[in-house]
């Protein structure tokens, strides 16, 4: 893996999809163990402005595809107390514009789960010429997920690794 770089991105519409994008999350369970899971990303688009900075980002995550390595836990997460995938199986993310930082960008945005919106700020840095890593922390209660803290901690750490497809030259 090459050293992180904050060089400007090529202006235009960058894309990523299920084969080039990974979203992972971490939360503590009742025994204070860290539970790690993944959510498939259906699609993502990054609109980059003429200054090489992301102006708009949109992504759709497939909640039905949640995978923590535990069939029972995954079933619970898909249920009404957590993601309620029968109601809507998609978690939407919209953000922008990005703010340049010495390490990359700060990307203020919003998650939308069943119409409940939650602000989230991603710290983004490049990990290669067309790849990025974004991290954020959020409180699951801000998305309306209200289960006892004895079951799962309220703070969730999210990491997204993306190999972006640049716009045509």
Model-assigned labels for residue ranges:
Residues 1-169:
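Low-complexity, acidic/polar, glycine-enriched regions of mature
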């Amino acid at each position: 893996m090459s050293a992180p770089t904050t060089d400007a991105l090529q202006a235009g519409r960058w894309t990523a999809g299920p084969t080039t994008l990974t979203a992972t999350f971490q939360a503590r369970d009742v025994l204070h163990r860290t539970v790690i899971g993944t959510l498939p990303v259906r699609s993502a688009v990054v609109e980059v402005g003429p200054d090489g900075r992301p102006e708009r980002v949109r992504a759709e995550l497939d909640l039905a595809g949640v995978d923590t390595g535990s069939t029972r836990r995954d079933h619970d997460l898909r249920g009404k107390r957590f993601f309620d995938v029968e109601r809507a199986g998609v978690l939407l993310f919209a953000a922008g514009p990005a703010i340049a930082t010495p390490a990359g960008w700060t990307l203020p945005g919003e998650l939308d789960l069943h119409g409940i919106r939650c602000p989230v700020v991603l710290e983004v840095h490049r990990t290669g010429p067309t790849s990025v890593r974004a991290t954020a922390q959020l409180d699951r209660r801000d998305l309306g997920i209200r289960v006892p803290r004895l079951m799962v901690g309220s703070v969730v750490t999210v990491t997204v690794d993306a190999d972006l497809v640049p716009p045509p030259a």
